Amino acid sequence: MPKYQSSSNNKGRKILIGTALVTFAIIIITFFSGSLTPTKDLQGVISSLPNDKLLGLSNFLSSENSKNQDELLNKIEKLNKKLFQAQDAKINKLEEQNKLILQELKLLKSPPTSASIRDKLTYLYPYDSESKFPAYIWQSWKHGLNDERFDEKFRQGESQWAFKNPGFVHELFNDDTAHTVIKYLYQQVPEVIEAYELLPETIMKMDFFKYLILYAKGGVYADIDTYPLQPIPNWTPENVSPLDIGMIIAIESDSSSPDWRKEQIRRLQFAQFVIQAKPGHPILREAIAQIVEQTSVKKLESLASSGGGPLKLIGNTNEKSLKISQWTGSAIWTDVVFKYFNDYIQSSVFQKVTWKEFHKLQTPKLVSDILVLPVKSFASDVEEPKDGKIEDPLAFVKHYAAKIWKSG
């Protein structure tokens, strides 16, 4: 049956084409000779044809015309689509260029020279609490990835940060590139650059760098001796909106020992080996300002006592560790966080916040816009199973706690 229908259709099509050709021939002959019929014009020739032939011819011509129109419309539609895509691409490119230009102009604008270090930092990178966490992961280490001195354990952690967070920009800086980035981002605040260059230990420069890169760019900073167990978006509890959070930190130590002062500066300390923050956050600004001020004081003390020269840490290993903690590490970081909590203008917290608020913390706690995680979240002792399924939902990062500053 289908073959019969196809043959019949083809036959009818041939008849219509033949009719059209005959009609055309009659018109031509009539026009040039006038000998076949007395009809003198085209209208007369057509009117002399039988009605059934005229109907078939009309249908055929209408069908062909409709087909041609459809093809033309399809071509126009494809052309329009191409033009719109090209236009969208140009607009996106222009928007990116405008952003870069605005960033460059912002860096070229100098804050007033008479302004305080805090005012200069605020001027350069103001805080927008309603912004999103930028999708950046920052790390630093004294050796590059291609250096044979790059520890294999650190290399595995570095690769896992990228693997577990495919939508994030992941950058690893060495000593030279970190220095270059700081000089670029803080060219309008020379006090910051000078303080960075004066710091006497590699680990102190790493500490300072993490605050500086997070303050300017936001995102996540992770020390090189960390290993991610879960993707970064898992850090935020389901019942908390990321827009309500300006920073995510964890507790580093929560001592109940009466001799805790021998090992650390504060009884409870916040970790700074992993931090997630929005750019321009006031806690980061205060940490940077205090480090700059401390370094400036130590520079003056060095000039007064020995006529200048490079700054140095004096003492045994434990004494040096405590001094580093007070200068750039966990102790100063903890003090700055508590200062923020207890400044109700900044934090909108109207009651005094002490270490007791976080003592033996087992679940995430939101204070102001700071999400504080328990010790196990960023210093988990969980080993990642082969199937990748972590039993403890709050185990986010392993921290090897390597004393990397010793080889500074």
Model regions and ranges:
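Small-residue hinge/turn detector
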Residues: 207-219
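Glycosyltransferase-associated regions of secretory-pathway enzymes
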Residues: 2-206, 222-408
